[in-house]
Amino acid sequence: RFRIKDVFGDVDHLEGGGCLYCHRGIERISKNHKFRCTKCHEGNRRGKTLLAAHKNLVSNPSDLDNASKYCGKCHADQIEQVEQSNMATGKSMIEVTRYAWGAQEEGKTMYSLRPKVEEGELSLPSVSEGEVVDGFLRTKCLRCHLDSAAPHRPGDYRAGGCAACHMIYSNDGHTLTQDRAIQAKVRKSQAVRKDRFKRKFAVKSLTNPRAYPVMHKFTTAVPSVQCEHCHNENGIGNEFEGLFSPANRPDSFYQKTGADKPVLYGTEHEFLLPDIHRERGMHCIDCH
């Protein structure tokens, strides 16, 4: 089973001036990324106020809209692969689902979330403009593509782009960072987050306070819990962990009986035996 040291290795906590005057204690993102904060996050390290220091700030340089600029000098090949992967484009999910609903011909890839226009690909139609299946895809199947924002509720916390995998979030959004600025923000939201595993918290996932990663540190030793922030439905991540989601019930049922029930990924679970590979301590990355 992964320990903190297995995931992150040695951790360096930074001190100094500029950004580190407020963010004292923040973890070095990687021993191979010994850059100034502003090299990736922009902003103004000499700013004397929050507004001045955070002017033009890029909160997630690894977002796919930013990655080619901030990560591409060293990781151009990886970015190109990720940008055309199914996790970014959703092409396979779109093709299979639209075919099953009778909205397109078999084997004809027409739509993508990141279309290659020169190859004749199109953006997936909006909910109002497309077929019924396109609305289903946008609100269900494609909720977890790399450009989408994650719901602010237990099990679903994550970043986007490269950080969706390489920046680890816990299921409850708890952070171990020693960044004093982030710790101050977390303390302010504690009252709101005290019921965070209850259904009444999960249903407000669009307005709940955001979570922060376990540490401000990249890793390639990605634990299964990170994969399961997206891969938790259709019997993949949840059953691997020994969780089974019962059939959905009408909202009126939950309003009367379930507001205080514990949920993960926005739903209740029954407990089953975990997958044998999980019991033996294996993680997704051991095979995938």
Predicted segments, located by residue:
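Short sequence/structural segments immediately N-terminal
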Residues: 1-288
